Structures are given as C-alpha cells and as structure tokens.
Amino acid sequence: MSKNMEYRKHRIEYLRTTVEYSLFGGEGGTREAHLMFHVDPEAGSYEEQLTAIRKAYHRILSRKVKIRGMVPVFCRYFLSDAANQWEALQAVLQKEPSCAVSVVQQPPLDGSKIALWVYLTSEPNAAYKHYWTAGAGVSCGKSERQMKTLLKSYEADLVGKG
C-alpha cells in the first residue's frame, strides 16, 4: 500500500483561527493526522483565545471528512504564561474526552497566548499499541542512573500491561 500525504491550511474567520494539518495514510490502512491550531494574536484575552482554539478543534473534528472518525492520541498546548494560564486550561480539559495532554511554556511565535498541536489516528493497529506517558522523571543521582531507573520503570509498566 502506498502512503498518501496531504497538507492543508484552513481558516475559520469568525473564530480568527487558522488550522494547518497534515494527513497520512490511504485506503484500507490506518490514517494519521497532525493538526496545528493558531489564533490571531489580537483575538482577545487568553480565555477568549482558548475558547476560539477549542471551538476550532471541535469544528474541524466534526466537519472535515478526511478527519472525521479519527481520535486524538495527544494534544500539546503551547502557552505564553503557563503558570497563570494552566488553571483555565485545566477547567476546559476536564470537560473533554480523554487523551494524553502536555503543556509547554513556550509562547507561540505569532504573538498569541496559546497554540495547539493535536495528533490523531483513525484506528488502532492490531500489531502494536501506543502507550503515552508524561511527567516521568528521576530527581536523584547522575544522569546515567536517572536514565536507567526511568527505563526500568517503563519496562515494569509494559510488563504489567502484558
């Protein structure tokens, strides 16, 4: 099966939001998509920009034929001031379907207060399964020891999952 790649850009004017997306896969196989949501920097407060991003996210997932039926594997939020923005984001995320979420204290280059990167897939593959984890770390010892401890922890988690 040959893999198809498609790159698109979609503007949602009333939300002042742009979505760039890349689609991978083809007929009869697992499809993948990477979506990057940007909001205009002058589109209001952080809360207003967060609302616009979330509305754009739901609109794209429900209306774009090639994305319909795909499920999010992870969402990565880029925030301009994570310490002060996390609480509002957390309140929104509690109302959303579950997927791995990461938050990066890195202001979007365009000057907005928030951007969102989403990875989606159409169906699980019977040959393998993705496991996503976040926040793991070992704070004591030298870097080699930290790495070994962390890898042993991952190994134990995988053994526990069968």
Spell out what each predicted region is.
Residues 1-162:
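Short, polar/acidic, helix-capping and beta-turn segments at strand->helix junctions
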